[in-house]
């Protein structure tokens, strides 16, 4: 049913949910709290101007063995979350392990716990083109994949704006292939 809603656009608002995947755990650890706050403010402000309601950020590489805290901001009405876990399977296991005993686990509630509010529209992969984040299987299922050829430390709100502008030019296929109607 959820797939049908996605495919038909039923219940879809004009807001956009973006996943950004970039940097390594070590690069994330080198950022100070002030640097994270400044970065999130720039991302949130740019996202707000583009009708984005949620930006979820994951590292592209590194070891999950060194703990890094989940960071959350609300900037200009945009929920920005930096979730420092490379391994999507471990992230799923952690969410399931921490599931409240009285809360029914459905596809919708599990999805919200894993990726935040709303369906993911676009996945921006930061760094050299062609790097597919295998840990983001859940996020890649129906989100449009866009490579951003900049270094993680240099990714800014302007880059996010470019991602959203490119996303808006695409014909959404929701996991399907483009069919050439002229043949």
Functional labels for PLM-detected ranges:
Residues 1-183:
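Flexible, compositionally biased loop and terminal segments
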């Amino acid at each position: 049913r959820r797939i049908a809603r996605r495919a038909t656009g039923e219940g879809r608002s004009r807001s956009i949910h973006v996943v950004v995947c970039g940097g390594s755990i070590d690069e994330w650890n080198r950022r100070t709290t002030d640097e994270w706050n400044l970065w999130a403010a720039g991302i949130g402000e740019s996202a707000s101007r583009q009708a984005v309601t949620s930006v979820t950020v994951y590292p592209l590489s590194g070891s999950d063995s060194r703990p890094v805290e989940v960071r959350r901001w609300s900037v200009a009405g945009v929920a920005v979350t930096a979730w420092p876990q490379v391994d999507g399977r471990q992230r799923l296991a952690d969410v399931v392990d921490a599931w409240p005993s009285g809360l029914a686990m459905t596809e919708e509630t599990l999805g919200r716990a894993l990726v935040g509010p709303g369906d993911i529209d676009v996945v921006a992969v930061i760094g050299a083109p062609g790097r597919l984040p295998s840990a983001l299987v859940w996020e890649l299922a129906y989100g449009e994949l866009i490579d951003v050829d900049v270094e993680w430390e240099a990714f800014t709100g302007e880059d996010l704006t470019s991602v959203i502008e490119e996303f808006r030019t695409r014909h959404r296929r929701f996991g399907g292939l483009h069919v050439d109607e002229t043949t």
